[in-house]
Amino acid sequence: MYSLARPLLFSLDAERAHALALRSIDTAYRTGTTSLLSTRPVPLPTPAFGLMFPNPVGLGAGLDKNGEHIDALLALGFGFVEIGTVTPRAQDGNPKPRMFRLPEYQAVINRMGFNNLGVDALVANVQRARRRGGLLGINIGKNKDTPNEEATSDYRYCMERVYPLADYITVNISSPNTAGLRELQEEQSLRRLISDLRETQEALGAQHGKRVPMLVKVAPDLNDRDIDAAARVLADLAVDGVIATNTTVTRPLIANHPLAAEAGGLSGAPLLGQSTLVLRRLRARLPESIPLIGVGGINSGADAVAKMAAGASLVQCYSGLVYRGPQLVGECVNAIRRRREAPSSGAVAPL
């Protein structure tokens, strides 16, 4: 079905196509025709962060920034959906055009800039959702006009608002599209921010009588020394999990493409190797008590298996859906199932 719709979507501006695709998924959900888009995979229960995921394949943050399509997206067969990034106050993001497809590379460049309706609007949408069939992650960030020295207050405010509703919360400090945000990954800044948020997490757990896991999403552009420093901080502060990785600002694999000079984060197939290297290094540096979600460049079931072999407990897709459609979800679940049943058949050589 998606193969028929893709030419129409690709004839449109990327951001308009994004909106049309979401409306179409919603329509299919409301009319009971989601099965025409994808077949829900047989469950593959997977534990992580003290939660049990129906299957290990999730939707990465960014597709549904405001939590307006949760039920329709879960119906596609995802084991979990991550919404956001959301900020305390609504903001428009960066000027358009700000999203570009690179079909030759099965890639996307975006510089959206945390465009969203604000955390209060997201909370209202989540409260209306039925949330059947999978778990919900909520990805939080800071407003672009909030200085880094005051970033903790933005993250804390969002955490307080979404804590009663989220199955897990992701702290996004790795988007390349908010000026200065990635500086929060520097060792001392990271330690201050995550220490404060861990205290907030524990206080909210006592207040609400439940512990919601807190994950941290990191960039693929960290060098080995920075990865090791981040791993030390995250292990010291006992975060619940790490998502590796966000998009990249580097362009080595698409250097000759006319759009390579566009500012923003590159995602899709060219990110697979780089993001998986970071994932593998983090797995080697972090205790097994801190599970990892592998994201970046998953365009096939084999790519999902490569993430698992590199140390991921769960995986997320986003740009791959642009090129493969919802069938990618079941393909990834089934590939991971085969690896789980016969681990040697799913092994991959070191990157």
Curated annotation (Swiss-Prot):
Keywords recorded for this protein, A-Z: Cell membrane, Flavoprotein, FMN, Membrane, Oxidoreductase, Pyrimidine biosynthesis
GO biological process, one term: 'de novo' pyrimidine nucleobase biosynthetic process
Cofactor note text: Binds 1 FMN per subunit.
Annotated catalysed reactions: (S)-dihydroorotate + a quinone = orotate + a quinol
Binding site for FMN: 61-65, 85, 139, 172, 217, 245, 268, 297, 318-319
GO cellular component: cytoplasm; plasma membrane
Membrane topology (UniProt): Peripheral membrane protein
Binding residue positions for substrate: 65, 110-114, 172, 177, 246-247
Cofactor(s) of this protein: FMN
Active site positions, chain numbering: 175
Compartment(s) of residence: Cell membrane
Single GO term (MF): dihydroorotate dehydrogenase (quinone) activity
Keyword Oxidoreductase: yes
Annotated EC: 1.3.5.2
Main location: membrane
Origin superkingdom: Bacteria
The protein's enzyme class: oxidoreductase
Pathway(s) it belongs to: Pyrimidine metabolism; UMP biosynthesis via de novo pathway; orotate from (S)-dihydroorotate (quinone route): step 1/1
InterPro entries: Aldolase_TIM, DHO_dehydrogenase, Dihydroorotate_DH_1_2, Dihydroorotate_DH_2, Dihydroorotate_DH_cat, Dihydroorotate_DH_CS
The family this protein is said to belong to: Belongs to the dihydroorotate dehydrogenase family. Type 2 subfamily.
Function: Catalyzes the conversion of dihydroorotate to orotate with quinone as electron acceptor.
Subunit relationships: Monomer.
Name this protein carries in UniProt: Dihydroorotate dehydrogenase (quinone)
